[in-house]
């Protein structure tokens, strides 16, 4: 449990019942780096006088919504700049970072974060180059299958780890490498003359769900890697007793993004969510504390903005389908927030990845 007393942070470990067996208490798993992120953002909430949703709504209703947006966006930009500066300083100390690894769960904003980090790295005189793990899938017939017999593309072993590490090592030695392109129609890698050679100013940016898994890059020296974990960690509570689950933040983002860009209804996104969460529990969360730094992509004001976009999508879920209960719960939840329009949100905001209107290309 986290709470603020005066200007100090109080931290208490509380064991909670197991989901499958309420008679058994869960073991306490220490997550010191994530705790530091919560402490930092709770401290800022306290400074701004926002301890719960009621405080936030009052600030919006008294004409301070734009101020909240500006401060929240500035805090994120400052944090991204600090991460870029830390990467650069490591090179000055003789441990030049050659590979930045970015991981995080679904709809955490990894893609926009990587683009904004690349901008900040360029201000330090570095040349970021993105590497896509999607191009390193094994041939389709070699892809592992899940318990239902379907191709499991979220598995680490759906990737050609040997080729990936061989090419990374060659790049870090200064050799020229022809990068593969995965043809999803044929289910095979192709080579189209996409060659790459990096110099001392180039830094590779790798974003993906397996980026923090040590099995992904076992042959790359630890000193050459900088690991970042990105997630939307909600740090405002409904009241003094009810915390907002961080997964609700990401689910609302995904519902809006899937509707805007992938043609999926809220019903379809909600139905897929349990399998997405299962993949996160298996492939992402166990490795989050491996990160050198954690970045909180949640914005203090975002539920108020998400409400305006999510309400019409959620209300379209039929009452007679299994997903209606979850849609109704989310609708009831977002109505606790005073709605805020997105016109004041800058085009580089992480939220633009889901709402649209971003100045970045995806």
What is the predicted role of each segment?
Residues 1-6, 11:
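Single conserved hydrophobic/aromatic residue that forms the stacking wall/gate
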Residues 35-81:
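Charged, amphipathic alpha-helical linker segments immediately N-terminal to NTP-binding catalytic cores
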Residues 91, 218-362:
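Conserved NTP phosphate-binding and transfer environment spanning the P-loop NTPase/kinase superfamily
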Residues 94, 164-223, 273-287:
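Glycine-rich phosphate-binding loop used to anchor ATP phosphates in small-molecule kinases
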Residues 100-102:
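Hydrophobic anchor at the beta1->P-loop junction of P-loop NTPases
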Residues 110:
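Conserved lysine of the Walker
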Residues 113, 117:
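Hydrophobic positions on the alpha1 helix immediately C-terminal to the Walker A/P-loop
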Residues 129, 138, 142-185:
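Conserved nucleotide-sensing/catalytic segment adjacent to the nucleotide-binding pocket
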